[in-house]
């Protein structure tokens, strides 16, 4: 990270997170069969404590979920320091919001993503390396 100042990395992380969140939740709600394409081949999803790894297993998992309507309230992001992920541009994205799965009540959720930049000669694509989803049940 020495060649570019930290503010540039933060700005890049924010732009990537904003674009990613729009693509991810639109795909989740409207084109779920394509959702696993946003994940790296070795990615792991932890959904309320249950781990799912690999694109084929992720596809099967997402297809089992009822149709959804996500509403995003908060998006926070930060670049992951180069010492933690050498030679990889990595961003941590934290999301809070509500989701209504068909046949279920609306619930609060938190979701954390670790995204890595996958560069090709023509562009850079952000892929999910890790995803942790949790329903948020508040104490009354």
Curated annotation (Swiss-Prot):
The modification N-acetylalanine is found at residue 2. Transmembrane segments: none annotated. Pfam families: NTF2 (PF02136). Keywords: Acetylation, Cytoplasm, mRNA transport, Nucleus, Protein transport, Transport. GO terms for cellular component: cytosol; nuclear pore; nuclear RNA export factor complex; nuclear speck. Residues 16-135 form the NTF2 domain. The keyword Ligase does not apply. InterPro entries: NTF2, NTF2-like_dom_sf, NTF2_dom, Nuclear_transport_factor_2_euk. It is found in: Nucleus; Nucleus speckle; Cytoplasm. Gene3D superfamilies: 3.10.450.50. GO terms for biological process: mRNA export from nucleus; protein export from nucleus; RNA export from nucleus. GO terms for molecular function: small GTPase binding. The keyword Repeat does not apply. Heterodimer with NXF1. Forms a complex with RANGAP1, RANBP2/NUP358 and NXF1. Interacts (via NTF2 domain) with NXF1. Stabilizes the NTF2 domain of NXF1 by heterodimerization. The formation of NXF1-NXT1 heterodimers is required for the NXF1-mediated nuclear mRNA export. Preferentially binds Ran-GTP. Associates with NXF2, NXF3 and NXF5. Does not bind nucleoporins (NPC) directly, its association to NPC is mediated by NXF1. Stimulator of protein export for NES-containing proteins. Also plays a role in the nuclear export of U1 snRNA, tRNA, and mRNA. The NXF1-NXT1 heterodimer is involved in the export of HSP70 mRNA in conjunction with ALYREF/THOC4 and THOC5. This is NTF2-related export protein 1. It comes from Mus musculus.
